[in-house]
Amino acid sequence: APGGYGSPQGSSGTDVPAPLPVLQNADGRVPWCADGYYLAVRPQFTFDSDFHAGAYYVQEASSQFVGHIVAACGGIRGGRVLDLCAAPGGKTTLYSTLAGRGGLVVANEIVRNRAAVLADNVRKWGVGNVAVTVNDPSQVARLEGWFDAVAVDAPCSGEGMFRKLEEARTEWSEAGVALCAERQRGILREAWRTLRP
């Protein structure tokens, strides 16, 4: 089941309940995300004004695990965070909330139309501490040693989509995996340069 998590206000410590569309459909809490809920079924979120107003963001529960990792590493409140392969923005909204208004999240997406979706999701989330950029990782790497934390959800060969999409299974190839692995190595090489020593 998809996970849905509540508002940025709820994540940042104020006692704001999850939006009604999430609570009405909740099928238990996501143990590693304080504001995460499993959803029994996936409702038509696109018709929900709370969703469009940024009251919640829907993503897989596994994607919400990054909040647990960030906490285990000491948190990012007030820090500078690079989210290098950021679209569509689910993890970016989480980093934004965890960094707080005193922090900065640079959310980069190299594909322009995906960056537009990212920018829209960040705008709806409304924390106001995210700068969306459209750069090749080599350009971002010029900010050498500038970020306190760097997140990379690199493009992959799509095996995780096998259970959802028939086309993911039919388009898969060993050559595609090799190409993705090389691309990932390049992205990680550039991302590493931006991390504060």
Functional labels for PLM-detected ranges:
Residues 1-197:
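S-adenosylmethionine
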